[in-house]
């Protein structure tokens, strides 16, 4: 059976991603001074204005407006003619402390309060909220990610690269990408459509822009094995994209959760990542779920693997754990679930410790996806549990 599947990504200059990066830059600054900071920071960006609000409990002191401006300038909004400029935009803040009712459940999990479990203070952290988290991996790409979102991210990263290194100096920071892949019997066989929408200077023609994007962005990214003469290419299909960024669209933290994860290939529990410290299971449990899924697939236990976790606020252990191999399991699935629960500790404190999450690593995650990347900061992408998983099945 043949079918088409599409995923999108956005550049770091997209308004929603500006907001994500500001929120995570603030989180990083606080974690750098106080690794136990409790942070939940939301950002709104619009024409000439940044609004930052949230709940923070920390010993750190950071200049939030300075962090916001620095982030905006690093993204590339450096000139007033772009309609948004890190030097001149206004920055408003409204930050207060974390609710003591929430802190009550996070600081000491229900299991500790009822005497069910004895643990040190850090291991006894309760989940910062209820929620549903999914982790996924597939062997269809070296990144163990679905091909559509992988290529969409690479195109978005390439757009930023050729803008910043001067290869295409007429590009501006805002941009979006979209890739449609044709699958046959659940295997990717070709790229059906590539869509690039990129902000640009007013004096570049549509024809010249299209030619430059094909030569310097699309051709270096799309693998030859997936190209054919039927591949459709769309570049700025409206014909013009001069007004962009926060001047054209308001941006908010947490509005690109599908871009951040698996491109719509699997379900999403709804919780966003950026601006949240790792006691928030919206973030840390998603990372742990990806870590489990990637190691399971890399160990050869399944070709595709999905795990769902759910939590209750103030309770350390997950309420439920579900797995799905889509019929690709090479081992007994009941045993696989049992092995996973024995090898991996899904309590928030244990996740934070295992993945070393109390570090200022989050700004980098806030653009081009949280998964499928091999930089040092992305500890949830490590394959250091493959051997243990194999041993559990005598492989």
Curated annotation (Swiss-Prot):
The source organism is: Thermotoga maritima (strain ATCC 43589 / DSM 3109 / JCM 10099 / NBRC 100826 / MSB8)
Please tell me where ATP binds in this chain: 14, 174-176, 240-241, 249, 255-256, 272, 276
Protein name per the record: S-adenosylmethionine synthase
User: Which of this chain's residues are annotated to bind Mg(2+)?
Assistant: 16
Lineage of producing organism: Bacteria, Thermotogati, Thermotogota, Thermotogae, Thermotogales
Ranges for the region named Flexible loop are: 98-108
Which residues hold L-methionine?
55, 98, 249, 280
- What is this enzyme's EC? 2.5.1.6
Gene that encodes the chain: metK
Q: Cellular component GO terms, alphabetically?
A: cytosol
Cofactor: binding details:
Binds 2 divalent ions per subunit. Binds 1 potassium ion per subunit.
Could you tell me which pathway this protein works in? Amino-acid biosynthesis; S-adenosyl-L-methionine biosynthesis; S-adenosyl-L-methionine from L-methionine: step 1/1
């Amino acid at each position: 059976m043949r079918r088409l599947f599409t995923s999108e990504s956005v550049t770091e200059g997209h308004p929603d991603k500006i907001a994500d990066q500001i929120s995570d830059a603030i989180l990083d600054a606080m974690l750098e001074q106080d690794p136990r900071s409790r942070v939940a920071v939301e950002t709104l960006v619009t024409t000439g204005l940044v609004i930052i609000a949230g709940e923070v409990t920390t010993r750190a002191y950071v200049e939030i407006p300075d962090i916001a401006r620095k982030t905006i300038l690093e993204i590339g909004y450096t000139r007033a003619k772009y309609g948004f400029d890190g030097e001149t935009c206004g920055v408003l803040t409204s930050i207060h402390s974390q609710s003591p009712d929430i802190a009550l459940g996070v600081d000491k999990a229900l299991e500790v309060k009822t005497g069910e479990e004895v643990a040190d203070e850090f291991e006894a952290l309760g989940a910062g909220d209820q929620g549903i988290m999914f982790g996924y991996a597939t062997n269809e790409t070296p990144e163990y990610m679905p091909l559509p979102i992988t290529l969409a991210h690479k195109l978005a990263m390439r757009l930023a690269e050729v803008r910043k290194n001067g290869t295409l100096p007429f590009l501006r920071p805002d941009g979006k990408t979209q890739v449609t892949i044709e699958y046959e019997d659940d295997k990717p066989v070709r790229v059906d459509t590539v869509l690039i929408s990129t902000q640009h200077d007013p004096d570049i023609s549509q024809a010249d822009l299209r030619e430059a994007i094909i030569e310097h962005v699309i051709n270096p990214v799309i693998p030859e094995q997936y190209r054919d003469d039927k591949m459709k290419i769309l570049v700025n299909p409206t014909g013009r994209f001069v007004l962009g960024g926060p001047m054209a669209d308001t941006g908010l933290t947490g509005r690109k959760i599908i871009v951040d994860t698996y491109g719509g290939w699997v379900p999403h529990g709804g919780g966003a990542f950026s601006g949240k410290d790792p006691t928030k299971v919206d973030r840390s449990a998603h990372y742990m779920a990806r870590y489990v899924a990637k190691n399971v697939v890399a160990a050869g236990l399944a070709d595709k693997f999905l795990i769902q976790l759910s939590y209750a606020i103030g309770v350390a252990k997950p309420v439920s754990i579900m797995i799905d191999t889509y019929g690709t399991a090479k081992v007994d699935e009941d045993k696989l679930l049992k092995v996973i629960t024995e090898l991996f500790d899904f309590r928030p404190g244990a996740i934070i410790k295992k993945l070393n999450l109390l570090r200022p690593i989050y700004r980098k995650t806030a653009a081009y996806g949280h998964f499928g990347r091999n930089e040092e900061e992305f500890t949830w992408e490590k394959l250091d549990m493959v051997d243990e998983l194999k041993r559990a099945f005598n492989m």
